[in-house]
A protein has these predicted regions:
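Single conserved hydrophobic/aromatic residue that forms the stacking wall/gate
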Residues: 1-11
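Beta-strand-turn-beta hairpins that frame and shape the catalytic cleft
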Residues: 99-108, 138-145, 246
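Active-site environment of divalent metal-dependent phosphoester hydrolases
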Residues: 16, 55-60, 82-84, 100-101, ...
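Active-site neighborhood of phospho(di)ester-bond hydrolases with catalytic His/Asp-centered motifs
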Residues: 12, 46-55, 75-78, 145-151, ...
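A short acidic, amphipathic alpha-helical/loop segment
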Residues: 63-67, 84, 88-89, 156-160, ...
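Cap/insert and terminal regions of metallo-dependent hydrolase folds
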Residues: 152-240
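Active-site-proximal loop/helix segment associated with metal-binding centers of metalloenzymes
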Residues: 15-29, 109-142
Length: 246
């Protein structure tokens, strides 16, 4: 149930199926770096819908396309992603324009930026970075969950924190990097520290590490950071396949 438990897991091909992303940090490393920690049947057994924040290979790949039942509701950010996923055989693809309801849960789209202003000014990199949404999950009597998505810290993130006041914040903190750019295309440890200061009453869940080649920050790095800053009570760093009860 989206209300009671949060499992953050992409359905990916077997370990080393794909070459690393060209032009990124550690590009020689094939990916996924790990296999799925649970069987596909177990993973999908209680899934009632899938949220695809964007369709980059590390979020939506051939195994996801082949394994997810084609009748399962898929929630996406825009028309382009909807058309792509329909072309892959799925027949219930819904765009979160602003918000929608599903099984007593309200899903609200939030904005972000999959890289810095400098990166989006690059005519080659900008279309590759593309768009990536975040999602707010709200349900009666349940904590409000903010899935930040693949973004750096932007005014859209600030607006979401102010507007929705989330109780649980899921942050992609692998600090994925493009060669030739000092900054990252997603968040990292400094953003965790910033979030703790910004929302000290929220539970932060740090994910999107140790599975794809271009993430420069590992779980070990994050754990060292939170321990060194005495913020263990605020931040959880789940293992692959771990389910966190909210």
């Amino acid at each position: 149930s989206l209300r009671r438990r949060q499992r953050q897991m992409c359905i990916r091909d077997r370990k080393d199926t794909y070459p690393g992303f060209e032009g990124t940090f550690n590009y020689q490393q094939r990916m996924p770096i790990v296999d799925l920690p649970v069987s596909m049947d177990n993973l999908l057994s209680n899934v009632t819908a899938v949220v695809v924040t964007h369709t980059h290979l590390d979020h939506w790949d051939d195994t996801a396309i082949k394994s997810i039942p084609k009748s399962l509701p898929i929630f996406v950010q825009n028309t382009a992603d909807k058309e792509l996923i329909i072309s892959q055989g799925f027949n219930d693809v819904r765009i979160i324009f602003e918000s929608l309801e599903f099984n007593g849960i309200t899903l609200r789209k939030t904005g972000g930026s999959h890289g810095t202003v400098e990166m989006y000014a690059n005519p080659v990199l900008a279309p590759l970075a593309g768009d990536a949404m975040g999602v707010i999950f709200e349900a009666e009597g349940e904590p409000t969950v903010y899935l930040v998505g693949d973004t750096v810290w932007t005014s859209d993130v600030e607006k979401a924190l102010l507007r929705f006041d989330p109780n649980v914040i899921i942050m992609n903190t692998g600090y994925a990097q493009i060669l030739g750019f000092e900054d990252s295309i997603i968040m990292g440890t400094k953003d965790i520290g910033r979030m703790v200061v910004r929302k000290p009453e929220a539970k932060i869940i740090a994910v999107h590490m140790d599975t794809v080649n271009h993430t420069a920050t590992s779980r070990e790095d994050v754990r060292k950071f939170i321990k060194g800053n005495n913020i263990e009570i605020h931040v959880a760093v789940p293992e692959d396949g771990e389910t966190i009860t909210l």
